[in-house]
Structure formats: structure tokens, C-alpha cells
């Protein structure tokens, strides 16, 4: 609209509802693409690499550092264990147990 006052010429009414648009996609992936993605995921999980872990001693709360070599899946398992009931002991506290 232009100007200070509206006129009937400037008002546009749409009496018909808009056409519905289908939102479903009919495209399908080839099974070979799925297999390539799955193999790439497995390959990255099977590669072992070193991980440095810094945690605290379960007895005296000193900082403990260790390095492990494992796969990505295994480091996630270790992370879950460390968040649970698994405690790492420092060299000072280990002989006392």
C-alpha cells in the first residue's frame, strides 16, 4: 500500500486456498551408497590410535595420567567405565591395597 489511507483498489483478496504441496520425497538411495557409508564407519572405528587419559586417583584424588591404544568404540567403553564405578589408582596408593 502506498499513502496514508487504504483504498479498495489496494486490497487483494485471495478467495481460493493455495494449492497443497506434497512434502514427501520419492527419491531412494541405492543400496551401494548405504554399504559404502557403513564400511567407512566401520573402518574409522577399527583404526587404533593412542588416547591420553587424565583422571584422578580413586583414593587420594591426585592427578593420574595414562595413555592407551584402542579403537574409537573401545575408548567410549572406557569412558563409560570411568564415569561409573571404575577407579584408577596412582602409584602411591596402588601398593597400599
From Swiss-Prot:
One of its GO terms (molecular function) is protein domain specific binding. Pfam families: E7. Residues 1-41 are annotated as: E7 terminal domain. One of its GO terms (biological process) is symbiont-mediated suppression of host innate immune response. Highly phosphorylated. Keywords: Activator, DNA-binding, Early protein, G1/S host cell cycle checkpoint dysregulation by virus, Host cytoplasm, Host nucleus, Host-virus interaction, Inhibition of host innate immune response by virus, Inhibition of host interferon signaling pathway by virus, Interferon antiviral system evasion, Metal-binding, Modulation of host cell cycle by virus, Oncogene, Transcription, Transcription regulation, Viral immunoevasion, Zinc, Zinc-finger. Transmembrane segments: none annotated. It is found in: Host cytoplasm; Host nucleus. A motif (Nuclear export signal) lies at residues 75-83. One of its GO terms (cellular component) is host cell cytoplasm. The keyword Iron-sulfur does not apply. Homodimer. Homooligomer. Interacts with host RB1; this interaction induces dissociation of RB1-E2F1 complex thereby disrupting RB1 activity. Interacts with host EP300; this interaction represses EP300 transcriptional activity. Interacts with protein E2; this interaction inhibits E7 oncogenic activity. Interacts with host TMEM173/STING; this interaction impairs the ability of TMEM173/STING to sense cytosolic DNA and promote the production of type I interferon (IFN-alpha and IFN-beta). The E7 terminal domain is an intrinsically disordered domain, whose flexibility and conformational transitions confer target adaptability to the oncoprotein. It allows adaptation to a variety of protein targets and exposes the PEST degradation sequence that regulates its turnover in the cell. Belongs to the papillomaviridae E7 protein family. Plays a role in viral genome replication by driving entry of quiescent cells into the cell cycle. Stimulation of progression from G1 to S phase allows the virus to efficiently use the cellular DNA replicating machinery to achieve viral genome replication. E7 protein has both transforming and trans-activating activities. Induces the disassembly of the E2F1 transcription factor from RB1, with subsequent transcriptional activation of E2F1-regulated S-phase genes. Interferes with host histone deacetylation mediated by HDAC1 and HDAC2, leading to transcription activation. This is Protein E7. It comes from Human papillomavirus 44. The gene is E7.
Amino acid at each position: 500500500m502506498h499513502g496514508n489511507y487504504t483504498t479498495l483498489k489496494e486490497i487483494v483478496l485471495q478467495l481460493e486456498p493455495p494449492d497443497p504441496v506434497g512434502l514427501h520425497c520419492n527419491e531412494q538411495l541405492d543400496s551401494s551408497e548405504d554399504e559404502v557409508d557403513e564400511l567407512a564407519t566401520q573402518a574409522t572405528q577399527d583404526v587404533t590410535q593412542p588416547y591420553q587419559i587424565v583422571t584422578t586417583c580413586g583414593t587420594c584424588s591426585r592427578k593420574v595420567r595414562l595413555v592407551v591404544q584402542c579403537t574409537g568404540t573401545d575408548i567410549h567403553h572406557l569412558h563409560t567405565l570411568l564415569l561409573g564405578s571404575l577407579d584408577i589408582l596412582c602409584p602411591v596408593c596402588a601398593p597400599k591395597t
